[in-house]
């Protein structure tokens, strides 16, 4: 698979096993679990502190979110937690990546989240996966993409404290997408690029939108 050719190894397979220490695992899970709270916090900040731009900021967030899911309809890529489960970790470790055809049309089984299994945030991630994680929504990473939009909106707000508060959650969220095997590294990179592109495109399209 091209990720192995680009990075020299499979990040989604080796990241968690290399950094399996409980505090690191919990920080990763905390970052991933912070996804929806980040969206809510940015929206609430604009509502209470910059109400004139609340409608614009909300539109940018929601439009970004739904654009990713439209992409997933036309580019159905299975994340590693689903693909590795389907083909077996031994095949992945040996550099063999068999095609699975329409397997994910009828199967949604995934690997358990790697890391410290007794952690509070680990449990939150497992609950989130059970409630809403689906096989073919991996490329680009909407978690990285929409959280990148959140960071740009925090920057746009001019509130340095908001930006600095969100920064560590964003950092660990981006890493966690690969660490917990929800995404391949290339998915996270694509999420960063597309999230930035969506932010500027949607902000340009909504220049005249005010409450």
Role assignments for model-derived ranges:
Residues 74-156:
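Membrane-interfacial catalytic/cofactor-binding modules of polytopic membrane enzymes
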Residues 6-49:
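Hydrophobic alpha-helical segments and helix pairs
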Residues 27-30, 56-60, 161-171:
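Alpha-helical transmembrane segments of integral membrane proteins
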Residues 40-75, 82-98:
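Interfacial segments of alpha-helical transmembrane regions
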Residues 31-43, 66, 141-150:
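Hydrophobic alpha-helical transmembrane segments
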Residues 1-5:
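Conserved small/polar residues in nucleotide/adenosyl-binding loops
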Residues 118-211:
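Membrane-embedded catalytic cores of phosphoryl/pyrophosphoryl-handling enzymes
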């Amino acid at each position: 698979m091209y990720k192995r050719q680009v990075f020299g190894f499979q990040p989604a397979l080796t990241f968690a096993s290399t950094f399996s220490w409980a505090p690191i695992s919990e920080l990763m899970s905390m970052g991933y679990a912070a996804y929806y709270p980040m969206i809510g916090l940015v929206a609430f900040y604009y509502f209470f502190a910059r109400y004139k731009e609340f409608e614009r900021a909300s539109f940018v967030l929601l439009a970004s979110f739904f654009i990713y899911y439209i992409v997933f309809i036309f580019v159905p890529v299975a994340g590693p937690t689903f693909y590795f489960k389907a083909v077996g970790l031994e095949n992945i470790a040996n550099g063999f990546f068999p095609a699975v055809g329409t397997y994910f049309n009828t199967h949604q089984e995934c690997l358990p989240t790697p890391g410290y299994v007794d952690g509070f945030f680990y449990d939150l991630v497992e609950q989130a996966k059970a409630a809403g994680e689906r096989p073919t929504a991996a490329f680009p990473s909407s978690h990285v993409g929409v959280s990148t939009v959140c960071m740009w909106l925090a920057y746009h707000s001019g509130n340095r404290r908001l930006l600095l508060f969100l920064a560590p959650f964003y950092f660990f969220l981006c890493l966690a997408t690969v660490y917990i095997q929800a995404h391949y590294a290339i998915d996270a990179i694509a999420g960063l690029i597309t999230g930035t592109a969506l932010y500027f495109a949607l902000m340009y399209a909504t220049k005249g939108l005010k409450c």
